[in-house]
Amino acid sequence: MLKRSFDKSKLPSRHVTEGPSRAPHRSYYYAMGMTEEEIHQPLVGVATCWNEAAPCNIALSRQAQAVKMGVKQASGTPREFTTITVTDGIAMGHEGMRSSLASREAIADTVELTMRGHCYDAIVGLAGCDKSLPGMMMAMVRLNVPSVFIYGGSILPGRLNGEDVTVQDVFEAVGKHQAGNYTDAELEVLERVACPSAGACGGQFTANTMACVSEAIGLALPNSAGAPAPYESRDQYGEASGRAVMDLIEKGIRARDIVTRKSLENAARIVACTGGSTNAGLHLPAIAHEAGIEFTLQDVCDIFRDTPYFVDLKPGGKYVAKDMYEAGGVPVVMRELRRAGLIHEDCMTVTGYSIGEELDKVTLEADGRVIYPVDTPLSTTGGVVGLEGNLAPEGAIVKIAGMSDDQLVFTGPARVFECEEDAFEAVQNRAYAEGDVFVIRNEGPAGGPGMREMLATTAALSGQGMGKKVALITDGRFSGATRGFCVGHVGPEAAHGGPIAMLKDGDMITIDALKGELSVALSEDELAARKDAWSGPRETIYASGALWKYAQLVGGARLGAVTHPGAKDEKHIYADL
């Protein structure tokens, strides 16, 4: 154990542990078995999103114990607490998905309130699913305390008929089943083997994308994102994270010393080169917002456009997170990006060293199977690109990983649906034609409310063999597991009177991922006339409660669908109170 002393006169916990007036507070600590020494050490929040909703977060409570050991080894006092999470895999395809994106804000808010209320000096945050990762990182940057993020790890792939399978295969099997190409018995076998362990979805879906971001942005220890949830090595990363946060307290390194414009650009690079989730286009601007940095969807997409895609991960490729970890993980990917001059090497990390200094320690080379050399990429542009045009003045985003150049332009008639359920019913009934452009509107952050993911619909289309024969645009979102030509985050959203609200069946829509354009063959005068005749936002059933409140506060997808003014308007920093 490393014995060292800290000056508590400038730490937030002095407000609850120091001086005669805090005797009542210390009584509570003694009631929990804390020693005098532990009371007067720095108090470190160990925050998890543990719950029994799904395998994504089920291992976090155990992993938190390793983090606490690390904090104690470095002369800190860990204080474990949990917050909520909504797991997309369970919320998918029904009204529960409206709670998903709102849960990101709830996670950030509740972590902030817990830290503020109990005057914790630093935080180690553990998260394991799509919204809990960005929510936890947002809280760290908002609080601007010494912070270390650690991912709970990915699930192991299942095996069926000698091949790896994931939950993505199950979603797509539903479409095959509806098309009569998959039996009840086959579906039952697949659903039982696809998810064999604890951990988040194994492909480069949203959770693993944001786990890679946590390393690239500098908030997580190098290579800590890769080990699957069941691996014992996760405990070693947990202990190391606990020790690391104590070093950050000692050195005075805070979250905003790490999260800068340059580190956000590094994070966007890792998303692009791994063919990551389009949801990163929502979460990176939201994390930036907490630091007072304007980093828009278009900024993210500009980086995507000139970043090669060279890591062959599902859903666009062949492999899963475990395979990338065994090939060297994020450090090897970052090393390849550095070879191409695509990394800001001077960015600080939670190790106390810069990204460049950490990459100097990496000796593994790209294996050419999972991680290709950057100079022989799978494609010369990122796996995710941004779009703008008269249908999306505030931008949109599309994932093109695994698509060939001849699939990157699509023109077809609009098939307009007012919600996802209507679109899914049309797919089930095969009430659409090859060449259609599905338009699913009223699914934006405010209009949904909640900006649902459309995986049920896109997976069903893929399962019917139509994933490459139709296209889909929405003011909602897509799961990281989505395949096909699917455009999300169309802004302004329908509820705010965006052009997507003015579309009618048969309008000719063009999606051009090569030029970065999303347009409809209507004149400005016609769009204006339709806007004048527009009856206003569709009424929702959410007239009270958390989703009503969220709809009143949430901003557009372009800036991350955030719900408060952000650091640019703050009048104090929590850690300095």
Curated annotation (Swiss-Prot):
Q: From which source organism is this entry?
A: Dinoroseobacter shibae (strain DSM 16493 / NCIMB 14021 / DFL 12)
Residues annotated as catalytic? S479
Enzyme Commission number(s) of this protein: 4.2.1.9
Q: What is this protein called?
A: Dihydroxy-acid dehydratase
| Cofactor(s) of this protein | [2Fe-2S] cluster; Mg(2+)
What is this enzyme's catalytic activity, as reactions?
A: (2R)-2,3-dihydroxy-3-methylbutanoate = 3-methyl-2-oxobutanoate + H2O; (2R,3R)-2,3-dihydroxy-3-methylpentanoate = (S)-3-methyl-2-oxopentanoate + H2O
Biased composition, class Basic and acidic residues, residue ranges:
1-10
- What note does UniProt attach to the cofactor annotation? Binds 1 [2Fe-2S] cluster per subunit. This cluster acts as a Lewis acid cofactor.
